[in-house]
Amino acid sequence: MSKIIAWDIETCPLDTNTFTSRQDRRHSLLVNAELDKNPSTSYEDASRKACSLHPMLGFICCISVAVEDEASLMRAEVHSFVADDPETERQLLIDFRDFVGQFRGMDTWVTFNGKRFDLDWLLHRCLHHGVQAPGNVRMMNRNPYQNQYHADLACVLKSPAGLADLCDHLGIESPKQAMDGSGVAQAVAEGRLDDVAKYCEADVLATLECYLIVKRFAAAAFA
């Protein structure tokens, strides 16, 4: 029986003291752009945001995966992989790759903005650590116009809105409650990896629920 596999990542900034000269230049450009756009933002917040959004300036601290049988009425199984620094990130990537490697059939992969963000981070961080990236061609499909095998809801609906907005639109409880993306770096710094995993898991379950609703009422959008 085929599976529906929703997944999501959380990211953290690298220590700017470890940056190469090229990373420093990239960091300065991105921070200055953020400060120009939001003058009331502190330098620290602008730096944290810039690093958490660029895979050469940050690392993946959590990947969560929700797996559900297409015909099942049972709640999806959820698995999380966490890292508290760039060194442990390498094992996170290996564990995630090995876990998703078991799915090689006619499965459907589901993300929200995964083709532009999550997959880009996954590839960059695997390359940085010399880790073989997942080999599933369905999961790794980044074509924004092909959503049959990798259903990126941000590409399917093409609306300038986030996951929380889509949840609100569909009447689904928002995963952005006890924490949102801006709080992930602080939680990791404080050693609260369980909180980060719970937040990431809430994201993948919400993404899965959104997908099931959209697929039910607009199945042709995934053709």
Predicted features, each with a name:
Residues 2, 58-86, 104-223:
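Metal-dependent phosphoesterase core characteristic of DEDDh/y 3'-5' exonuclease domains
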Residues 2-124:
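Conserved non-catalytic scaffold segment of RNase H-like nuclease domains
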